[in-house]
């Protein structure tokens, strides 16, 4: 997902495109079709050099989920996580 399309998706949801929001969406796009936990999203952002905290990732994922931009698959245990809503 290009940075421009990520920014469009965020603006369509009424959100300002921040480094954390853009990073979370790009990580979820690159992991598709696999779901990622919040910790896995944080690890991927850390490896990419994106300066965000675990708390920020948790807040961003919760906000994006509430607005329908990402979806929590609701499964328990392994395989539980967040997916980019198509």
Where are these regions (language model features)?
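Short, cationic-aromatic polyanion-contact patches
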Residues: 75-86
